[in-house]
Amino acid sequence: MADIMFALLFGAVSLLYATVGQAGGTAFLALMAFASFPSNEMRPTALLLNIVAASYSTWLFNRGSLVDWAKLMPLLLASLPTALVGGFIVLDERLYKTVTGLVLLLAAAILALRRARDGEPDRPTPLWGATSIGAAVGFVSGLTGVGGGVFLAPLLIALHWASPKQTAALSAPFILANSVVGLAGAMYAGQTPTADTWLFALAALAGAMIGTIVGLRWLSQTMTRYMLGAILGAAGIQLLFF
């Protein structure tokens, strides 16, 4: 019964994140931290759930011709090698919780401070900037189990490289690819997902299916962003201080 309730929480997280083009890796980690999952299971479980959720979102965005692959490729190609390197690195439990807690707090701050720029024109994306950001986000993705979209999205918007809707469409395949590579590195390093991942994955997929459609058609992003920011901030504090 507890596993089913926990799966429903994963599904709810996936739904909320999918409304803004994200998979939910940061909140998956937050939930597992609250439930005191072993640290060697948290990262691979979060990455696997990212893959499930982002696969559907990527398919839906691509089917609607919303993914700007030319803009995505420099970010993606730079991120994959560093995501693999990050996945190879296994931190001890205290250091992992410290790093992940800081990542969650940073993600919460980004979500809270992010502003929509629908009416402003996009700027050209410089190759050096795209590769630098892609490499940095990829490394953090592989190291912590965060797909990277929660950092990529606000950067794209803040730098005027993409509109919010374009950013959502770019984030899903970025998260998918980096999560696949990061999971490969984590499993090579001896980490494996929790035994109940299949149940959590079904819930995450259902949430992604609903959330992506809701986000594309109806829901304002503002309230979802602040709610998720509060969850991530609380989880980051819990990891760092308790």
Where are these regions (language model features)?
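Juxtamembrane transmembrane-helix boundary motif
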Residues: 1-18, 23-35, 39, 56-140, ...
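Short N-terminal amphipathic alpha-helix/helix-capping patch enriched in small hydrophobics
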Residues: 24-28, 44, 51
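Hydrophobic alpha-helical transmembrane segments of multi-pass integral membrane proteins
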Residues: 166-183
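Short hydrophobic/aromatic, small-residue-rich stretches within specific transmembrane helices
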Residues: 46-50, 171-175, 197-201
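Small-residue hotspots at the loop-to-helix junctions and early N-terminal turns
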Residues: 39-44, 168, 172
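Transmembrane alpha-helices of multi-pass small-molecule transport proteins
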Residues: 45-60
